[in-house]
Amino acid sequence: AMEMLKNIEEELKKEYNVKRAPFGWYKAFKLSCKGHPLAELSRQIECKKEEEKEEVVSNWYILTPEGELIEAEKFDFKGYEGLKKFYEYEAFGSRKVEKEPAHIKLMKEHELVDYESGSDYGNMRWYPKGYLIKRLLEEKVEEICLNAGAMEVETPIMYDVNHPALSKYLKKFPARQYRVKADKGKEFFLRFAACFGQYLMAKDMTISYKNLPIRLFELAKSFRREQHGEVTGIKRLRAFTMPDMHTICRDEKQALEEFKKQYLLSLEWAKILEIDGEIAMRFVKDFFEKHRDYVVDLVKKWGKPVLVEIWDKRYFYFVMKFEINMNDSVGKAFALSTVQIDVENPKSFDITYIDEDGKEKYPYLLHASISGGIDRCVCALLEKEAMKIKNGQKGSYPFWLAPTQVRLIPVSHEFVNDCLELAKKIKARIDIDDRDESVSRKIRDAEREWVPIIIVYGEKEKNEGKFKPRYRFECSDKEVTVEKLNEIIEEKMQGFPFRKIPLPILLSKRPKFR
C-alpha cells in the first residue's frame, strides 16, 4: 500500500504540486454528507418517467352591462383605468412582491397588526385595535350568511394526509400544506380552506331533495404555505381567517339561483367596505354560451364592465367562478369575495342526496366567501385609504370600524372627570386624551389616528351643554347636544355590529405596542 501511495505521488508530481504527510496507524477520517430529512434543501430523487403537464389555455374578454363581449386587447379602457390595471395584472403580471404595498406602513403606524418574528412568515400578531376591526368584520359577514339561511358549523383544522378522498385532493396542492406529526407516525395537514371538514360532514349527512339547498358556513382559521416571495403584509398570508360557505344544490337551475343570491350579497359587502373593486368572471366556454343572458344580467347588477376569462374545456373543479378584486397601491390585484359552481367534488367525496324518484344523485356544490379573507378586508381598507392620502385626501375608517369613534379632549386636567361622566352618556367607542400635551397636539394625534369625531371640552362646553365637534365625514350639524350627537352616531351605526373599546378609556393609561 505504501509503495502504491509513493507511485501515485510521483505520477501526480508531474503535473501538480503534491505534498505527502505522515498519517499514523491510529488515525482515521470519514467523509459524509448529512442533511436533516425536513431541511428545505433536502431532496428525495426518484427515477420515473416525466408526466406531461397539460397547459391551461384561456382567452380574455371584457363583458359590458349591455351584453357586448369584446376581446380584452381590443377594448377601449377609457374611463375604466382600474379595470385596465386589473386585466394587465391578471394576464401578464407577477405575484412576486417587488415593492412594499402601502398598507404595511399604515397597519404599523395605527398599531393594528404586525409581523411576529417568533412564528413562521405570514403568521401575524393582531393588536387590540386591529383585532377589534377584524372581529367586527367577522361578526358582520357571519350575520349576512346566517340571514341568508346558512347553518354555522365548526370542523377540525387538521386532517389525515392518507384519507382516501383527501389524499387525491392534496396532490393538486402539494406545496401549500403545513404538515403535523402525531401519534403512531400518523401525519396530518393543516387545512388551507374549510372545504375538507364541510365535505366530510356533507358526506355523512342524510339529505333529501326537500332539504335543498343546504348552506354550511364556518369562520375558518386556515393555513397555506404560500411562496415566501408572494407573502406580504396582510394581503397574502400563511395563516388567515376565511368565512367559508358551501351550498349543496339539487341541480344546475338551483345552483344558478343560489349563485345569483350570493353574488348580490358579495356586491353588498363591497358597498359595506366602501371599496371600488373590479369583477372577474371565469367560465368553461360551453357553460358561458349556455347561460350568457344570465351572466349579462349579473353584470348589469354591477353596473360596469367586467373581466371575463374563458377556457375551451374544464381544467378545474368549477364551471363558473366570480371574484371581486382590488388593485393595490403598487399595481398588484388581490381577490376578496368569491362564488364558484363546483361539479367535481361532490362525486370525489361521495356527497349525495335522495331525489324525488328515490335514487341517490350527486348535487351541484357552491363555494362562497362573501367577504373573502378577513385579513384581506383589513388590507383592502388600508390600501384604499393609502391611495386617498396619496391624492391629498384624508384617510378614514368606516365609522362602524373606527377603533375610537369619539375622542374627548379636555382643555386641562380639571375637566377630566367631567369628560368621564360625559363619556357614559355617549353611545360610541369613546376615549379621553388626558395626557400632558397641548390641545393642538392632542387634536393632531387624534387626526393621525383617523378618529371620526373629536370634541374639545372646557368651561364653555360644561356650562352650555353643547359641543362643536370636528368630523372626519360630511355633517351639517356644527353644534350639538349629547342627544343630537347620539342621533348622529346611531345613524352612522345603523345595521352594523358594535363592540366596546378594547383599551383603557384614558390615553395616559395605554401602553404602546410598537
What residue ranges belong to the model's regions?
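Generic long, charged, amphipathic alpha-helical segments
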Residues: 391-444
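Conserved alpha/beta core surface patches that mediate binding of polyanionic ligands
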Residues: 85-109, 192-264, 318, 328-349, ...
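Positively charged, low-complexity, intrinsically disordered RNA-binding extensions
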Residues: 1-47
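Conserved, charged catalytic cores of large soluble enzymes
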Residues: 271-294, 395-418, 479
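Conserved short loop/turn motifs at secondary-structure junctions
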Residues: 125-132, 158-163, 279-288, 310-314, ...
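Metal-assisted phosphate- and nucleotidyl-transfer catalytic regions
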Residues: 268-335, 339, 512-514
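C-terminal structured "cap/appendage" subdomains that terminate the fold
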Residues: 423-481, 485-488
